[in-house]
UniProtKB/Swiss-Prot annotation:
PROSITE patterns: RHOGAP (PS50238). Gene3D superfamilies: Rho GTPase activation protein. It is found in: Cell projection, Lamellipodium; Cell junction, Focal adhesion. It comes from Homo sapiens. Residues 21-216 form the Rho-GAP domain. Residues 722-734, 822-834, 960-977, 1028-1038, 1211-1224, 1234-1245, 1292-1303, 1314-1323 have a biased composition (Polar residues). One of its GO terms (biological process) is small GTPase-mediated signal transduction. Residues 600-619, 735-745, 803-817, 839-848, 992-1008, 1246-1265 have a biased composition (Basic and acidic residues). The modification Phosphothreonine is found at T286, T679, T789. The modification Phosphoserine is found at S272, S346, S349, S387, S476, S701, S712, S778, S974, S1105, S1106, S1178. This is Rho GTPase-activating protein 31. GO terms for cellular component: cytosol; focal adhesion; lamellipodium. The lineage of its organism: Eukaryota, Metazoa, Chordata, Craniata, Vertebrata.
C-alpha cells in the first residue's frame, strides 16, 4: 500500500494508464507488484463475489465503464458501494477487461506458441515442466501478476460448489483475456480460428490453475529468473517507489533494454524479449510451422470465416456440436487442409475432455495441441492431414492414421510416428484426433473402433463414404466433409459428450447395459454401437465397463481378439494395408510379435501357447512374408509403441487414420492403397467391426486398426484380456480365453453369450470351431499362399498341432484362434473388405464384388499364394495390387497363420475342392472357393471374417463366409448390428464386406459365443427374427460346428464351413441346420450328426464337398435350414443376441449343439455354399437377405417381435419354404433362406454379387427380399447387420441394417458401384437415390412405408447417413436400407434395437424405432432425415451436416 500514493500520482501523470498500458511499464511506474485493478478487484470478489457465475456473467456495462473511469482517475474506486455490491459481476468484468486491454497479453504474444505447445505434450509431468519453463520466461511483472491472478482464480475455483465456476469454467472465461495470438488477431479470424484458439488457451489456463502450487511454488518468478528476478523485482519495485526512479526506470527500461547493461533490466528484458525472442525463434521455429498452418488456417479461416463467424465464433456450445457438425465437418473438409480444424478438434477435445473427466490434460492437450493449434509439425506436414499428423505424433498413432493419404511412405511429419503417419496420416485424423482426445487412451482404444464406428460407421460410412467417396475422391475434403458432416461430427462429438446427443451414441447410451456397452463403444466408436449389439451380449456383463470398460473391453476384446488375431490382425493389417500394407506389415511384424505375444498370452491362457505361438509363428512368418514393406514393420513397431503408449489412442486414431488412410488409400488404392484402403477401411471396419463385434475388432484391429486395434488389442488384451476378458475377453478373450476362462467367463459370457456362448457352450468345440472356423479360414489362407512356406508351414504346424490338439486345447486355442481368426478372419475379411473397399472406391464395382470375392477367396486364394489371393482379390478387387495381394494375402495368410493356419493343411491340399462353388459367381470366386477349400480352415478362420467381407464384396465370392459371419452377427443382434456398423464403417463396398466381416466376425464370434445362440438363434434367423442369428448361426455354427465337430478335422470341416461360409447359401443352409440343431439341442445333435454326416464326407474335403455340394444337398440343407428356421422360434429369441436373454438362450443352445450343428454346418455350409454359389449369382436372395437382414436386425433387438414381422414379410414366407425346399433349386430362395441364416452371407453375397449385378441384385433384392424377407427376414436381420453393415457400412447402425439391404443392394450396387462406393460418400447420396432407388423401389413394393419408416427412426441411418454418405448411397436403397438400418440401430442401440427389433416385420419395429429413435437420439433427427436423406442423399452428401 505504500505504493498506493505513488500509484495515484503515477495515475495522475499517466492519466488512466492502468487500462491499455503496458503491464511492465505500468507496474514500474506505479511501483506495484501487481496491478492495482487486479488486486482491488480480486480482493473484493474474494470477499463479496462468491456468487454464482462470477467472472462468467457480465456486469452492467454502465457500471463497468464507471468503474473503469474511477480506476483511471486518481481516486481508487470504492468497490464496496451499493451499486457495485448489487452488481458484483461488473467488478469481475472490469478485471477481465483490464487484462483484455493490455497491449501485450499477460501471457505474452511471444510465448503464446510456447504455451500452446507446452500443453500439447501428453504426459502431465512433461506438460508441467514445459509450462513452468515457459512461465519462467515471462517478464517478472507478468510473472508476478500471473501468479497473483492464478492464485486468486484458484481460490475462487475452490468455491465452485457455490459459484459453479470450477477451474475449467474459469479458464474458459479468462483464457481469451490472458492468452492471445497475434496471428489470429492479425488475421481477424473471429470465428473458427479464434474459437479454436480459445480452446487451446483454455487448456493452458486450466492447466496452470490446476497446477498453481507446483508452478508457482518456487517462490521465485522462475528458476532462471529466480535469483535475478527477485532482485529485478526489487529493482523494479524500488525504482517504482519513487516517481523519479520510476521515470528513470521507464527510460532506463528502454535504455537498458537497448544496452542491456542493467542486470535487472537485462534479465527482465531478456526474459520478456531477448529470451522470449530466442524462444520465439525456437518457438516459432516450431511455431512458425504452426503459424504457417495457422496462417493457412487463417487464410482458410477467412474463407470459412464467414461460415464460422455465422454462428461459430460466439457459440461455444454450438461450436462443440458444430465442431462435430460444422467445425468438425468443416474441419474435415478444411481441417485436413487447415489447422483450424485441429483446433476444432482441440475444442472438441476440450469439450470432450470434460466428458472424459479431463482425463489427462496431456491427452487433451495433446489433442488440443496436436490436434489443435499445436499441429505445427503435423499441419506443416500435411496441410489438412497435418493436423492429424501432429496428433499422430503425439498420440503415436496419428501418424499411422494421418499418414494414409500421400504420407503413406513419406508423411513423416510426425517424426515420432512419422513413418507410420506417413503411410497413414490423413485428414480424418483430425476427427480421430478429436475423437481420440475425447476417447483418451482407454476410451480411445475402443474409440478407434468406436471411431471406426463413428468414424467408420459414421465416419466410416462417412469413411465408407469416406473410403468410397473420400477414398475415391479423397483429394476433395469435400467428400470427406460430406461424409464427415454427418458421420464425422458424430465421430468427433459422439465419443463422449456428444455421444449422448448423437443418436448412435445417444441411443447406445440410452440403451440398456448391453446397449450401453454398445454405447460406450458407440460412444467411443460408432461401431461400438454396432458392436454394442454384439457387445451387449458379449460385453453386457461388463455393463459397468460399458463406457470406460466397454471401450477398454472393446479394446480388450480388440486386444484379445487382436492379440489372438494379432498375427492374423497383424497379417490382416499387413495384408490390409499394403500401402499401409507396409504399415500393416510393420505393424504386423511387431504386431505379429505383439499379436503373437498377446496371442500367446491370450491363447496361452486360453490354450497352449503353442497354438498361439504357432499362430504367432504363422503370424510372424506371415509377418515376415507379409513384411513386404518395412513400413508395415515400422508401423507395427510404432503400433507396438502405440500399443504401450497410445494403444487406446492408437486404436482409435489408427482406425480413423486408417480410415483416413483408407480414404487416401482408396485413391491410391489402385496400386498400393488397396491395402492401405484395406487397412483404413479395415481399421474402421476392424475397429468398427471390432468395436461392434469382437470379430469386429479384429477388423478394426486387424486391417485398419491393425496396428491400432492390434496394438490396442495386445495391450488391452494383456490388460483387458485378463481383467476384461469377461467383457472384452469375454468376447475376445472369452472367445480366446474362453477355452480356459470359458466357464468362468461364461457367466459373464452368458451376458456375453454371443461370445461366451460359443466358448462356454463349446469351450473345446468353440475353441475348435473358433480355431476350426478360424483355423479353417486360416488354413485356407495358408493354402492360398502355399508359396509362402512360412504360412504354409505355420499353417500345417498349426493344423498338425491344431488338428488333434485343436479339438481339445486347440479348442481353447481354437477359441482363441478362432477368435484370433475371427479377428484374423475378420481382419482378413476386413482386410478383404478394406481391400475391397479400397478397391471398391477404385474399382467400386469390380473391386467390391471381386474384392469381396477376391478377398473372400483371397483368403482362400492365398492358397496359391498370397499374391494369388491378392491377385484374386486385387485383380478382381483392384485389378491386382501387388500390395493388395500382399495385403490380402498378408492379411489372410498372416491371419490364417496367426490363426494357426490350421486345417489349412488338409484343405490346403484340396485346392481343387475349393472350386468355384464357393465363389462360383466368379472364376475368381471359384478359384477362391478352391483356395478356400484348401484354405477352408484359414478361410473359415480368416475367410470367416474376410470371406464374409469378401463375399460382401464379391457377393458370390464370399457370401457364405459373410453368411457365416452374418449368422454370427445375427447371433448377437447387437453384435451383428455392431458388426454391421463396423462393416458399414469401412466403406459401403467394403462396408458390405467389412460389415459382413465385422458382422461375420461378430457373428462368428457371437455365433461361437452364441453358438447356441446362433444355433438357437440361427434357426430363428432362418425362421425369421431369429433369422438374424441363423445367418450367424449358420455361419458360425458351421464354423463352430465344424470347429467342434471338425475339431479333429477342423481343417476340413472348417474349410467346409468357411467354404460354406464363403458360399453364402451353403453357409446359410449349413447354418440353418446348424441353427436348427442349435435350436433344438437334441435335434441339433441329430441334425448335427446329419449335417456332420453330410458334412462328414466333405469334411475331409470340406471345401470340395461344399463346392461340389450342389443344390441337392443345399436343398436338403435348406430344408434343414428351414427346420432350423422353425426351430428358430426359440432360437429367434436367442437370436436376439443383442438381448442378454437371447444371448443366454443362445448360450444354452450353443452350449452343446451349436458346435455340433456347426460341425454339421460345415457340410451344410458347403452345400449351401454350393447352392449359394448359384444363389449368390441370384441377386434376389441378396435382396431377400437384405430385407431379411433388415428384419433380422430389427429382430435381433427383439427376436420375438421379429417373428411376427417375418410374417409381415409374408411375401417372403413363400420363398422361405421354397428356399427351404429347394435351396439349390431356389438359389434365390436359398439365398433367401440363407437370407435368414445366410442373410448376412446372402446379403454379403448379394453385396458381392451385387457389385457384379448391383442392379440385378437390387432388382432381385426386392423379390428376394420378399422371400428372403420371410425366411431371410430374421436372417436378414442378421444379414442386414452384416450385409447392411457392409453395404451401409458407412452408417454404423443404420448402415448395418441398411448395409444388409444396402449391402446386398448397395453392396451389389456398390460392387457395381464400388467406385461410387468410393465415391459413394458423395455418390452414395446421389447413388442412394439412384442405387438406393432400386433398393428403395424394392423396399417400397415390399414394405415401402415400413422400410422407409424404419430408416428415419434409426439413428444408425443417422450415423450412416452422416458417416455414410456412402451409406447414404446405400441409403439409396432406402427401403432395404431402412430396414437394415432399423436392424442396425437395434443392434447399435439396444434401446433402438428393442424398439426396432419388432421391425423384422419392418413396420412395427420401425414405428417403434421411429419414436424411440427420435426420442432416443439426436441422430433421430438425422434418422428422421434419414428417409429424406435417402431421398435427399444429395442433401446429405453435399451437406452431411444437414442431417445433423
Amino acid at each position: 500500500m505504500k505504493n498506493k500514493g505513488a500509484k495515484q500520482k503515477l495515475k495522475r501523470k499517466g492519466a488512466a494508464s492502468a487500462f491499455g498500458c503496458d503491464l511492465t511499464e505500468y507496474l514500474e511506474s506505479s511501483g506495484q507488484d501487481v496491478p492495482y485493478v487486479l488486486k482491488s478487484c480480486a480482493e473484493f470478489i474474494e470477499t463479496h463475489g462468491i456468487v454464482d457465475g462470477i467472472y462468467r456473467l457480465s456486469g452492467v456495462t454502465s457500471n463497468i465503464q464507471r468503474l473503469r473511469q474511477e480506476f483511471g482517475s486518481d481516486q481508487c474506486p470504492d468497490l464496496t458501494r451499493e451499486v457495485y455490491l448489487q452488481d458484483i459481476h461488473c467488478v469481475g468484468s472490469l478485471c477481465k477487461l483490464y487484462f483484455r486491454e493490455l497491449p501485450n497479453p499477460l501471457l505474452t504474444y511471444e510465448l503464446y506458441e510456447k504455451f500452446t505447445e507446452a500443453v500439447s505434450h501428453c504426459p502431465e509431468e512433461g506438460q508441467l515442466a514445459r509450462i513452468q519453463n515457459v512461465i519462467q520466461e515471462l517478464p517478472p511483472s507478468h510473472y508476478r501478476t500471473l501468479e497473483y491472478l492464478i492464485r486468486h482464480l484458484a481460490h475462487i475455483a475452490s468455491f465452485s460448489s457455490k459459484t459453479n465456476m470450477h477451474a475449467r469454467n474459469l479458464a474458459l472465461v479468462w483464457a481469451p483475456n490472458l492468452l492471445r495470438s497475434k496471428e489470429i488477431e492479425a488475421t481477424g479470424c473471429n470465428g473458427d480460428a479464434a474459437f479454436l484458439a480459445v480452446r487451446v488457451q483454455q487448456v493452458v489456463i486450466e492447466f496452470i490453475l490446476n497446477h498453481v502450487d507446483q508452478i508457482f511454488n518456487n517462490g521465485a518468478p522462475g528458476s532462471l529468473e529466480n535469483d535475478e528476478n527477485r532482485p529485478i523485482m526489487k529493482s523494479l519495485t524500488l525504482p517504482a517507489l519513487s516517481l523519479p526512479m520510476k521515470l528513470v526506470s521507464l527510460e532506463e527500461a528502454q535504455a537498458r533494454s537497448l544496452a542491456t547493461n542493467h542486470p535487472a533490466r537485462k534479465e527482465r528484458r531478456e526474459n520478456s524479449l531477448p529470451e522470449i525472442v530466442p524462444p520465439m525463434g525456437t518457438l516459432f521455429h516450431t511455431v512458425l510451422e504452426l503459424p504457417d498452418n495457422k496462417r493457412k488456417l487463417s487464410s482458410k479461416s477467412k474463407k470459412w470465416k464467414s461460415i464460422f463467424n455465422l454462428g461459430r465464433s460466439g457459440s461455444d456450445s454450438k461450436s462443440k456440436l458444430s465442431r462435430n457438425g460444422s467445425v468438425f465437418v468443416r474441419g474435415q473438409r478444411l481441417s485436413v487442409e487447415k489447422a483450424t480444424i485441429r483446433p476444432a478438434k482441440s475444442m472438441d477435445s476440450l469439450c470432450s475432455v470434460p466428458v472424459e473427466g479431463k482425463e489427462t490434460k496431456g491427452n487433451f492437450n495433446r489433442t488440443v495441441t496436436t490436434g489443435g493449434f499445436f499441429i505445427p509439425a503435423t499441419k506443416m506436414h500435411s496441410t489438412g492431414t497435418g493436423s492429424s499428423c501432429d496428433l499422430t505424433k503425439q498420440e503415436g498413432e496419428w501418424g499411422q492414421e494421418g499418414m494414409p493419404p500421400g504420407a503413406e511412405g513419406g508423411f513423416d511429419v510426425s517424426s515420432d510416428r512419422s513413418h507410420l503417419q506417413g503411410a497413414q496420416a490423413r485428414p480424418p485424423p483430425e476427427q480421430l484426433k478429436v475423437f481420440r482426445p475425447v476417447e483418451d487412451p482407454e476410451s480411445e482404444q475402443t474409440a478407434p473402433k468406436m471411431l471406426g464406428m463413428f468414424y467408420t460407421s459414421n465416419d466410416s460410412p462417412s469413411k465408407s463414404v469416406f473410403t468410397s467417396s473420400l477414398f475415391q475422391m479423397e483429394p476433395s475434403p469435400r467428400n470427406q466433409r460430406k461424409a464427415l458432416n454427418i458421420s464425422e461430427p458424430f465421430a468427433v462429438s459422439v465419443p463422449l459428450r456428444v455421444s449422448a446427443v448423437i443418436s448412435t451414441n445417444s441411443t447406445p447410451c440410452r440403451t440398456p447395459p448391453k446397449e450401453l456397452q454398445s454405447l460406450s463403444s458407440l460412444e467411443e466408436f460408432s461401431f461400438h454401437g454396432s458392436e454394442s449389439g454384439g457387445w451387449p451380449e458379449e460385453e453386457k456383463p461388463l455393463g459397468a465397463e460399458t463406457s470406460a470398460a466397454s471401450v477398454p473391453k472393446k479394446a480388450g476384446l480388440e486386444d484379445a481378439k487382436a492379440v489372438p488375431e494379432a498375427p492374423g490382425t497383424v497379417e490382416c493389417s499387413k495384408g490390409l494395408s499394403q500401402e499401409p500394407g507396409a504399415h500393416l506389415e510393420e505393424k504386423k511384424t511387431p504386431e505379429s510379435s505383439l499379436s503373437s505375444q498377446h496371442l500367446n498370452e491370450l491363447e496361452k491362457r486360453p490354450n497352449p501357447e503353442k497354438v498361439v505361438e504357432e499362430g504367432r509363428e504363422a503370424g510372424e512368418m506371415e509377418s515376415s512374408t507379409l513384411q513386404e514393406s518395412p513400413r508395415a514393420r515400422a508401423e507395427a513397431v510404432l503400433l507396438h509403441e502405440m500399443d504401450e503408449d497410445d494403444l487406446a489412442n492408437a486404436l482409435i486414431w489408427p482406425e480413423i487414420q486408417q480410415e483416413l488412410k483408407i480414404i487416401e488409400s482408396e485413391e491410391e488404392l489402385s496400386s498400393l492403397p488397396p491395402p492401405a484402403l484395406k487397412t483404413s477401411p479395415i481399421q474402421p471396419i476392424l475397429e468398427s467391426s471390432l468395436g461392434p463385434f469382437i470379430p469386429s475388432e479384429p477388423p478394426g484391429s486387424l486391417p485398419c486398426g491393425s496396428f491400432p486395434a492390434p496394438v490396442s488389442t495386445p495391450l488391452e488384451v494383456w490388460t483387458r484380456d485378463p481383467a476384461n476378458q469377461s467383457t472384452q475377453g469375454a468376447s475376445t478373450a472369452a472367445s480366446r480365453e474362453k477355452p480356459e476362462p470359458e466357464q468362468g467367463l461364461h457367466p459373464d459370457l452368458a451376458s456375453l453369450a454371443p461370445l461366451e456362448i460359443v466358448p462356454f457352450e463349446k469351450a473345446s468345440p468353440q475353441a475348435t470351431v473358433e480355431v476350426g472356423g478360424p483355423g479353417n479360414l486360416s488354413p485356407p489362407l495358408p493354402p492360398a499362399p502355399p508359396p509362402p512356406t512360412p504360412l504354409e508351414e505355420s499353417t500345417p504346424v498349426l493344423l498338425s498341432k491344431g488338428g488333434p490338439e485343436r479339438e481339445d486345447s486347440s479348442r481353447k486355442l481354437r477359441t482363441d484362434l478362432y477368435i484370433d481368426q475371427l479377428k484374423s478372419q475378420d481382419s482378413p475379411e476386413i482386410s478383404s473388405l478394406c481391400q475391397g473397399e479400397e478397391a471398391t472406391p477404385r474399382h467400386s464395382d469390380k473391386q467390391n464384388s471381386k474384392n469381396a470375392a477376391s478377398e473372400g477367396k483371397g483368403c482362400g486364394f492365398p492358397s496359391p499364394t498370397r499374391e494369388v489371393e491378392i491377385v484374386s482379390q486385387e485383380e478382381e478387387d483392384v485389378t491386382h495390387s501387388v500390395q493388395e495381394p500382399s495385403d490380402c494375402d498378408e492379411d489372410d495368410t498372416v491371419t490364417d497363420i496367426a490363426q494357426h493356419g490350421l486345417e489349412m493343411v488338409e484343405p490346403w491340399e484340396e485346392p481343387q475342392w475349393v472350386t468355384s462353388p464357393l465363389h462360383s459367381p466368379t472364376l475368381k470366386d471359384a478359384h477362391k472357393a478352391q483356395v478356400q477349400g484348401l484354405q477352408g480352415h484359414q478361410l473359415e478362420k480368416r475367410l470367416s471374417h474376410r470371406p464374409s467381407l469378401r463375399q460382401s464384396h464379391s457377393l458370390d465370392s464370399k457370401p457364405t463366409v459373410k453368411s457365416q459371419w452374418t449368422l454370427e452377427v445375427p447371433s448377437s443382434s447387437s453384435c451383428a448390428n455392431l458388426e454391421t456398423e463396423r462393416n458399414s464403417d469401412p466403406l459401403q463396398p467394403q462396408a458390405p464386406r467389412r460389415e459382413i466381416t465385422g458382422w461375420d466376425e461378430k457373428a462368428l464370434r457371437s455365433f461361437r459365443e452364441f453358438s447356441g445362440l446362433k444355433g438357437a438363434e440361427a434357426p430363428p434367423n432362418q425362421k425369421g427374427p431369429s433369422g438374424v442369428q441363423p445367418n450367424p448361426a449358420e455361419t458360425s455354427p458351421i464354423s463352430l460346428a465344424e470347429g467342434k465337430e471338425l475339431g479333429t478335422h477342423l481343417g476340413h470341416s472348417s474349410p467346409q464351413i468357411r467354404q460354406g461360409g464363403v458360399p453364402g447359401p451353403e453357409s446359410s443352409k449349413e447354418s440353418s441346420p446348424s441353427v436348427q440343431d442349435s435350436t433344438s439341442p437334441g435335434e441339433h445333435p441329430a441334425k448335427l450328426q446329419l449335417k456332420s454326416t453330410e458334412c462328414g464326407p466333405p469334411k475331409g474335403k470340406n471345401r470340395p464337398s461344399s463346392l461340389n455340394l450342389d443344390p441337392a444337398i443345399p436343398i436338403a440343407d435348406l430344408f434343414w435350414f428351414e427346420n432350423v428356421a422353425s426351430f428358430s422360434s426359440p432360437g429367434m429369441q436367442v437370436s436376439e443376441p443383442g438381448d442378454p436373454k437371447v444371448t443366454w438362450m443362445t448360450s444354452s443352445y450353443c452350449k452343446a449343439d451349436p458346435w455340433r450343428v456347426y460341425s454339421q454346418d460345415p457340410q451344410d455350409l458347403d452345400i449351401v455354399a454350393h447352392a449359394l454359389t448359384g444363389r449368390r449369382n441370384s441377386a434376389p436372395v441378396s435382396v431377400s437377405a437384405v430385407r431379411t437382414s433388415f428384419m433380422v436386425k430389427m429382430c435381433q433387438a427383439r427376436a420375438v417381435p421379429v417373428i411376427p414381422p417375418k410374417i409381415q414379410y409374408t411375401q417372403i414366407p413363400q420363398p422361405l419354404p421354397s428356399q427351404s425346399s429347394g435351396e439349390n433349386g431356389v438359389q434365390p430362395l436359398e439365398r433367401s433362406q440363407e437370407g435368414p441364416s445366410s442373410t448376412s452371407g446372402t446379403t454379403q453375397k448379394p453385396a458381392k454379387d451385387d457389385s457384379p449385378s448391383s442392379l440385378e441384385s437390387s432388382k432381385e433384392e426386392k423379390p428376394k427380399q420378399d422371400p428372403g424377407a420371410i425366411k431371410s427376414s430374421p436372417v436378414d436381420a442378421t444379414a442386414p447387420c452384416m450385409c447392411e453393415g457392409p453395404t451401409l457400412s458407412p452408417e454404423p447402425g443404420s448402415s448395418n441394417l441398411l448395409s444388409t439391404q444396402d449391402a446386398v443392394v448397395q453392396c451389389r450396387k456398390r460392387m457395381s458401384e464400388t467406385e461410387p462406393s468410393g465415391d459413394n460418400l458423395l455418390s452414395s447420396k446421389l447413388e442412394r437415390p439412384s442405387g438406393g432407388s432400386k433398393p428403395f423401389h424394392r423396399s417400397r413394393p415390399g414394405r415401402p412405408q415400413s422400410l422407409i419408416l424404419f430408416s428415419p427412426p434409426f439413428p444408425i441411418m443417422d450415423h450412416l447417413p452422416p458417416s455414410s454418405t456412402v451409406t447414404d448411397s446405400k441409403v439409396l436403397l432406402s427401403p432395404i436400407r431402412s430396414p437394415t438400418q432399423t436392424v442396425s440401430p437395434g443392434l447399435l442401440c439396444g434401446e433402438l434395437a428393442e424398439n426396432t427389433w419388432v421391425t423384422p416385420e419392418g413396420v412395427t419395429l420401425r414405428n417403434k424405432m421411429t419414436i424411440p429413435k427420435n426420442g432416443q437420439r439426436l441422430e433421430t433427427s438425422t434418422s428422421c432425415f434419414y428417409q429424406p436423406q435417402r431421398r435427399s442423399v444429395i442433401l446429405d452428401g453435399r451437406s452431411g451436416r444437414q442431417i445433423e
